[in-house]
Each structure stands twice: as structure tokens, then as C-alpha cells.
Design a protein with these regions (language model features):
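A "functional boundary" signal
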Residues: 19-176
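Positively charged n-region of N-terminal signal peptides that target proteins for export
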Residues: 1-5
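Bacterial N-terminal signal peptides
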Residues: 7-15
Length: 176
């Protein structure tokens, strides 16, 4: 009798967790599908819902992936304020997760900062873009991750070419 109650309790406890994960997966699948169909408003909404759900579950990697997708879709439609607000929310979420995990999440910080850099590049704000580029450089150095370093070099090259600094862009590509 006690075993039956124990099993029933266990199933009832796990059911909402599995349902939340399924809902999040549905958000991501539907968002990708909407993106492929070029329904950007719906895709943005679904990526935002996935970000919120994943951040509540503490899945920081997938949450930041979904959040940066939503931010990208915001600023592609010139909703810069919303995109910057979302980036601030993601930075706060990363900080909370770093405190909880007692480790630095360089890759996620890099991802959000790079998205912010792309916004400044699209706005043709070279000064703020340079600040973000310097932040990316610091994050890549602190992380000591070759993948981030290569991503940084590629990003630097794009930045330099965008703002007419072709020699520096060529130098960044040579380092790759």
C-alpha cells in the first residue's frame, strides 16, 4: 500500500516537470518552423516564451540560445529597445546562474555581448560597437577557449570591414 502511494506521488511530482520540458521543446520547434516560414513576429514570440520557460528551469545554455534568437528577431524589425532590454535580462539571468553555480559562464556572456555588438553595427554606432568588441576580447581571453577566440577573430574582421578598416579586417582573418 505504501509503495503504491510512493509511486503515485513520484509520478505526480515528475509529471509537471516533464510537461514543462515538452512545452519548452514545443516552443522551440514552433519557433524554428515559424522562422523557416518567415513569420518573424510569431517566431520572436515563441523564442521569447522558450527563453522564459528555459530560464525558469535553469537551463542557461538553451535559454540564452532562445533569448539571442528573440533579440535578433527584435532588432531585425527595428525593435531595438526591446532587443536591448532582452539582452539586459539575459545578462541578469547569467549573473544569477553564475552565482548559483559558482562558476563563470563566459560562453553565454560572449553570446549576449556579440548580439549586442551586432545591434550596434546595424545602427552604425562604431563607438559602442568598439566597446562591445573590447568586451568580447576580454571574455575570450578570460575563458581561454579556442572556439571563442576564433569566433572573436571572425567577429573582429566583420566589424573592421563594416566600418571601412580593411587592413585590420585582413589582419584578423590572417590570424584565423
Amino acid at each position: 500500500m505504501r509503495i503504491t502511494y510512493l509511486l503515485l506521488s513520484l509520478v505526480l511530482c515528475l509529471c509537471p516537470v516533464m510537461q514543462a520540458q515538452n512545452t519548452t521543446n514545443q516552443f522551440m520547434k514552433q519557433a524554428q518552423s515559424s522562422l523557416e516560414k518567415k513569420d518573424y513576429t510569431k517566431a520572436r514570440y515563441l523564442f521569447l516564451q522558450a527563453y522564459k520557460s528555459l530560464s525558469q528551469q535553469g537551463d542557461y545554455k538553451q535559454a540564452i540560445d532562445a533569448g539571442t534568437q528573440a533579440a535578433y528577431l527584435y532588432y531585425c524589425e527595428n525593435y531595438y529597445q526591446e532587443a536591448f532590454d532582452l539582452c539586459r535580462q539575459m545578462n541578469q539571468f547569467i549573473l544569477t546562474e553564475e552565482l548559483k553555480l559558482q562558476k563563470s559562464l563566459y560562453e553565454q556572456r560572449f553570446q549576449v555581448t556579440k548580439e549586442r555588438l551586432e545591434m550596434y553595427i546595424k545602427l552604425k554606432n562604431a563607438a559602442q560597437a568598439q566597446v562591445q568588441l573590447n568586451t568580447l576580447d576580454n571574455l575570450a581571453s578570460q575563458a581561454g577557449d579556442e572556439k571563442l577566440s576564433n569566433n572573436l577573430l571572425y567577429t573582429q574582421a566583420g566589424y573592421y570591414y563594416t566600418f571601412g578598416q580593411n587592413e585590420q579586417g585582413d589582419a584578423a582573418f590572417q590570424k584565423l
